[in-house]
Every structure is written in structure tokens, then in C-alpha cells.
């Protein structure tokens, strides 16, 4: 945490799909069973911050694409809301992708992509800083698209004559391919011990 920050009120902004992808690569997990509130509180406690709010953002598959996973996410988001987490969900849309193999052949495949989550997170962060809702932005993501957001947070804070810390938190383990946080933020690496200590056991898939 930066020495410039005096107040410690933090809002956690959790990019659910990005956090899951990082945990999958780092630890080999197959289910998004992270406890977002517990993880936010644990990181804040290590740094002397007080968590004012946790906001969770994710894409959810359509019923016709994956009914089982949609049911799981619907139940998961319902529990998060009951726990006081602010939830923003967007549909995952199927997109056709093409890739060229080393031997020159072209491969076509379908992927599910979320649209609008990054923009929603950025808008909510800017609004929170403009309205002085927090002194620390705790961003669970490695998405470099947020580097410009970090610069904007600094500009807003400078105009307000205060310091706002912005940190990106993400899992790092033996399988991690990208160990960088968002440029322009403080990087908080989440190890397997901390990640496992904050699991939401209610989310275990049968």
C-alpha cells in the first residue's frame, strides 16, 4: 500500500471471469468457488484497510448454451447478493473464432465472450472516486485495459487534492503464465494458501 494513503476505506471491484481464469492457470481449479467477500476482507486486513463494499461483475452463459452452468451461476449470484455483495451480470455471447495452425490449416471454434463488463467496472470505479466513496480501489483483475482507468483515478484524485490508492489483486501459482498486475497499480499477488482460506464452500459443484 502506498505511504501516501491516510484514509483506509476500500471498495473491491471483482472481475469474476478474469479472477477465475487467473486461479485456473495458477492453481488448476475448475470451479469459481472463490469467496469474494472473504478474499477482499483478508487482503484489506493485511494492509489496514476497511472494506466499505464488495462489487462483483461477471458474464453468465445463456440457458441454451450451458443450462447447468447457468443454473450454478444463478444460484451463486443469489447467494452473493444475500451476503451483501453488489452484483452486475451480463450474458456470455457465443462467438466464432478462427486460428491458423503451424501447418497452415485454419481452425474454427466457438467461444463464449462477455461484453460490457470492463466498461461497467471502469464507470463504477470513476464514479466511486469522484463521489469520494473510497480511498482505495481494490481491483481483482489483470486486464491491462484498466491501465488507463488507473491513470484516470490518479488524475481525479489530484484534482480533489487527495491520494487514492489503486491495487490489482490476482492469484499466482505454479501454473501462472502472466504474473503482472494492471500497469499503474499496486500489485497484490494471492497465493494458494490465501486463496484456499477464502473459498466459499457452498459453491462446490456435485
Locations of the language-model features?
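Domain-level signal for Mg2+-assisted phosphodiester chemistry and nucleotide/NA-binding surfaces
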Residues: 1-110, 169
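Nuclease catalytic cores that cleave nucleic-acid phosphodiester bonds
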Residues: 87-206
Amino acid at each position: 500500500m502506498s505511504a501516501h494513503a491516510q484514509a483506509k476505506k476500500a471498495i473491491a471491484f471483482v472481475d469474476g471471469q478474469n479472477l477465475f481464469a487467473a486461479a485456473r492457470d495458477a492453481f488448476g481449479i475448475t470451479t469459481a468457488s472463490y469467496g469474494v467477500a472473504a478474499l477482499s476482507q483478508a487482503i484489506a486486513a493485511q494492509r489496514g484497510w476497511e472494506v466499505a463494499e464488495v462489487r462483483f461483475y461477471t458474464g453468465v452463459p445463456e440457458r441454451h448454451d450451458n443450462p447447468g452452468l447457468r443454473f450454478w451461476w444463478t444460484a451463486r449470484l443469489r447467494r452473493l447478493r444475500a451476503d451483501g455483495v453488489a452484483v452486475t451480470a451480463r450474458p456470455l455471447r457465443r462467438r466464432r473464432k478462427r486460428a491458423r495452425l503451424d501447418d497452415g490449416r485454419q481452425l474454427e471454434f466457438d467461444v463464449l465472450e462477455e461484453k460490457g463488463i470492463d466498461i461497467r467496472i471502469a464507470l463504477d470505479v470513476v464514479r466511486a472516486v469522484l463521489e469520494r466513496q473510497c480511498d482505495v480501489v481494490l481491483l481483482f483483475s489483470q486486464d491491462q485495459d484498466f491501465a488507463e482507468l488507473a491513470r484516470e483515478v490518479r488524475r481525479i484524485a489530484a484534482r480533489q487534492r487527495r491520494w487514492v490508492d489503486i491495487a490489482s489483486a490476482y492469484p499466482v501459482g505454479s501454473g501462472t503464465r502472466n504474473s503482472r498486475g494492471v500497469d499503474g497499480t499496486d500489485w497484490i499477488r494471492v497465493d494458494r494458501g490465501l486463496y484456499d482460506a477464502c473459498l466459499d464452500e457452498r459453491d462446490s459443484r456435485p
